[in-house]
Structures are given as structure tokens and as C-alpha cells.
Amino acid sequence: SVQAEWCSMIGTVYARTTGAKINIVQKGSGEALAQLMAEKDNPKTDVWFGGTGDPHLQAAELGLTAEYKSPSLADLHPWAQQQARQSGYKTVGIYSGPLGFGYNTELLAKRKLAVPKTWADLLKPEFKGEVQMANPASSGTAYTMIATLVQLMGEEKAFEYLKALHPNISTYT
């Protein structure tokens, strides 16, 4: 969920500050949630840090996370405070980021393809087999992409879009 460099830095600082030996395991949000669910009766995870909001809210709703009201909560953005309240203080948003798609300009130029500018552009036949997407079952970001499309288009049109996009997907990572 969080970039490896951030995980390494956080782990180093935490270990130095507390003297505790830690083991950081990097996973997608969906995979992390599945592990917490599987370990519900015998938890092996102490801290789940990072990832998209929806799986954290699901974990809170399922009773997989503990209540914690940070003394720094008032310093966070209003959306993060709302997430904490909504979850009964069992999760809190710590960062946000844009959702979009990236492309390889050199590959597009080599194949004489126009730069995709909208989600609809990714449906064009010239992109058949050229699009990669993370698996929403294991990636919180891919899950968030689907949730965003549902919010933008409505559920029926969003899933029609995903069905139309599928032939252009070369790999679900």
C-alpha cells in the first residue's frame, strides 16, 4: 500500500525511537484486509499502515481494528477527521492522492498512438491489449478506481465501462 522507501524510513525511525524490533510486510490494501480477516481469531498483525480508505473502513466495521483517538486528530484535514469519526476512531486517513492513469510517451510515439486523455479514450480499439490494471481484489487503488467510476458514472454505466475496457487489458497485476 505504501511505497517501499516510506516503509523503510518509518520502520527505521520507529525502531530507533522505541528500541523495538519490527518486521514490515508490504501488501496491497485488499490483500492486507484479507489477511486481517483470516487472522481475526489469532491476530499476527500489530499495525496496518497505509492503503486506501475503503478497506480500512471495512476492517473497522468488522471489528478488526482497535479504537485509538490520536491527540493530533484535530491537526488533520477535515476528511481525515470524518473518516476517524465514521469508523468509531478505528481508522484515520493520513494521506490522499490523485487517481488517474499513466502512459508511456515513448511507446505511444513508437506505435503512433494518441495520448489518452479521458477514461473513455482507454476504450478505443487501438489500445487493445495495451492497458494494464491492478486487480481490485488485492489492490486498494484498483478498488478505489472502480468505486470512483461508480460515483462518476453510476453503477450500471461503470460496470458497462469496465466490461468494455476488459478486451484492452493485457494484464491484471
For the regions a protein language model found, what residue spans apply to each?
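A short beta-strand-loop structural module common to alpha/beta enzyme folds
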Residues: 21-31
